[in-house]
Amino acid sequence: MAGHSKWETTKRKKAAIDAKRGKEFARLVKNIEVAARMGGGDPDANPTLQDAITKAKKSSVPNDNIERARKRGSGEEAGGSDWETIMYEGYGPGGVAMLIECLTDNRNRAATDVRTAMTKNGGNMADAGSVSYQFERKGQALLDKGELTEDDLLLAVLDAGAEEVKDHGEQFEVLCDISDLMGVREALKEAGIEYDSVEQVYRSNLEVPADAELARKVANLIDALDDVDDVQEIYTNMSVSDEVAAELAED
């Protein structure tokens, strides 16, 4: 969700231990397979694959699953799927703008499942281009704070093209132009700073604040979309204050 709110951080932690863990594993494994197919199966020569593997390991995906996905993607092992990325656009409750990114081997299934989740939870689909113009593609690095200070992080990434560093309580978020993403990644590595993820994301150009009632409705829609096997990422232009995030965390 846009803004990477503290509520989102709480939701992600909760998701790691609830019944959706298997879905998250499947997403991460799918990303490994696609990265290996696009850039080759050697993590040392394919930064995207290396980061996908690191992210999967941090989420406790079994090594066997990781290795099989790498081999399927690189062609070392049979059984890989013909994945394609599809972006659906729509509006949630309260007119909240939404982008739903899918990675699927069945375009018709993905479209049907996304549309069903949207219509059953107060959302509606939109024509291509009618929502996406409200978002821009950015490079993003997420890092657990630990002993890391914002000053140390800024010192490491500013010359590499970082545009903004956001403090989300237990995490830092670094945003940059997508052309600078690999430079930021290398700057973090050179500084010995461990990161959780480095990837391309969508960020809304103008965020819309939501009260607790609207945020709950949108959260329910996001949960329904998250249950769709083909859905990889969901982006919105909704922002949630610390107070609303705290209220939702108690739900």
Swiss-Prot record:
Q: Lyase: is it a keyword of this entry?
A: no
**Which keywords fit this entry according to its UniProt record?**
Cytoplasm, DNA-binding, Transcription, Transcription regulation
Q: Which GO terms describe its cellular component?
A: cytosol
In the record, what terms sit under GO molecular function? DNA binding
Which GO BP terms, alphabetically? regulation of DNA-templated transcription
Q: Where in the cell is it found?
A: Cytoplasm
* Organism whose genome encodes this protein: Corynebacterium urealyticum (strain ATCC 43042 / DSM 7109)
The record's comment on protein family reads:
Belongs to the TACO1 family.
Name assigned to this protein: Probable transcriptional regulatory protein cu0933
Against PANTHER family, the record matches this protein to: TRANSCRIPTIONAL REGULATORY PROTEIN YEBC-RELATED, TRANSLATIONAL ACTIVATOR OF CYTOCHROME C OXIDASE 1
Q: Where is this region: Disordered?
A: 56-79
Among InterPro entries, the record links this protein to: Integrase-like_N, TACO1_YebC-like_2nd/3rd_dom, TACO1_YebC_N, Transcrip_reg_TACO1-like, Transcrip_reg_TACO1-like_dom3, YebC-like
Concerning Pfam families, the annotation shows:
TACO1_YebC_N, Transcrip_reg
